[in-house]
């Protein structure tokens, strides 16, 4: 059987095994994935974070699912095609923000699910709407703020569905 990996990318102000990542890692393991989290602390430049993720994933053989929160969402999107990711799951992704390098127009070639809080005052939820429209991604807008901590249980269910759907025929994401 092919090895299956979920690789988490945390946000700018958090760490590799924060509350959201730890809770989603449990879901990943229950679905037969190995869970990994890249430590970006001390790396401010998004391009360096992308390079760090690509380097980390070179050591992993098998199917790869990327999960990113905030700036980690940007890193996951920017890396997905380079790593031939099977899918990406994004939480309040820092997309289309001033100061971040622009993403290539056809950057994504795998299924994506985006979760964002209506009350996010760090990254406007409209940025996730724009991304979901551009890439025909599933989008879940929740009653929450940027950290989404009050919705972790819901996000766990959404992530579980996302992982299960990856094993279904392409219809699951159409």
Mark where each language-model region is.
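Gly/Ala-rich beta-loop-alpha elbow adjacent to hydrolase catalytic centers
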Residues: 67-77
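Acidic catalytic loop of the alpha/beta-hydrolase fold
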Residues: 14-15, 97, 118-123, 146-147
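Conserved loop-alpha-helix segment in the C-terminal half of the alpha/beta-hydrolase fold
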Residues: 118-137
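Post-His helix in hydrolase/transferase enzymes
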Residues: 22, 126-127, 149-165
């Amino acid at each position: 059987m092919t090895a299956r990996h979920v690789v988490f990318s945390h946000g700018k102000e958090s760490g590799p095994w924060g509350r959201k990542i730890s809770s989603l890692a449990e879901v990943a393991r229950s679905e037969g994935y190995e869970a990994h989290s890249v430590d970006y602390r001390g790396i401010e430049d998004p391009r360096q974070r992308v390079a760090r993720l690509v380097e980390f994933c070179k050591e992993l053989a098998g199917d790869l699912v990327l999960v990113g929160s905030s700036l980690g969402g940007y890193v996951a999107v920017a890396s997905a095609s380079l790593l031939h990711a099977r899918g990406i799951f994004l939480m309040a992704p820092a997309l289309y923000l001033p100061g971040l390098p622009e993403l290539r127009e056809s950057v994504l070639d795998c299924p994506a699910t985006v979760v964002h809080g209506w009350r996010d005052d760090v990254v406007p939820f409209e940025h996730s709407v724009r991304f979901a429209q551009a890439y025909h991604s599933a989008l879940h807008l929740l009653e929450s703020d940027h950290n989404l901590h009050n919705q972790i249980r819901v996000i766990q269910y959404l992530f579980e569905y996302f992982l299960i759907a990856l094993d279904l025929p392409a219809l699951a994401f159409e």
